[in-house]
Amino acid sequence: MGLEKSLILFPLFFLLLGWVQPSLGRESAAQKFQRQHMDPDGSSINSPTYCNQMMKRRDMTNGSCKPVNTFVHEPLADVQAVCSQENVTCKNRKSNCYKSSSALHITDCHLKGNSKYPNCDYKTTQYQKHIIVACEGNPYVPVHFDATV
């Protein structure tokens, strides 16, 4: 009886392992948002090469140059709190976007027109603007940077 059980459980174990294992190394949407958009310290934001450095450091120039990106220089908790602020319609017409109640310190990175991969060259511009983020999950956290206003 014990051998029969193990003959059934052994393949089930590997089936389950094959199902769970691929997600172990995968970045969640919330983690991707943090990697691509959060820089609370903003240590080198005054440098004209800030975007070039950060886009490379945060893996947004692998294989191609990401055309536009925004970094937020506020504590993560403050950005996560946006998910409980004013509900607005997202650019894609979904209803899970939220607008910050106050202007936040941000840096916009725009790929320069003559720039080509692998030499991604970005224009760095600092602003204080309201941000709009899409939120999902439990806990309800930012998973997509939608816009600034």
UniProtKB/Swiss-Prot annotation:
Keywords from the UniProt entry: Disulfide bond, Endonuclease, Hydrolase, Lyase, Nuclease, Secreted, Signal
Localization annotation: Secreted
Tissue expression profile of the protein: Pancreas.
Chief location category: secreted
Subunit structure: Monomer. Interacts with and forms tight 1:1 complexes with RNH1. Dimerization of two such complexes may occur. Interaction with RNH1 inhibits this protein.
Summary of the function given for this chain in its UniProt record: Endonuclease that catalyzes the cleavage of RNA on the 3' side of pyrimidine nucleotides. Acts on single-stranded and double-stranded RNA.
The name this protein goes by in its record: Ribonuclease pancreatic
Species of origin: Mus musculus
UniProt lineage: Eukaryota, Metazoa, Chordata, Craniata, Vertebrata
Gene encoding the protein: Rnase1
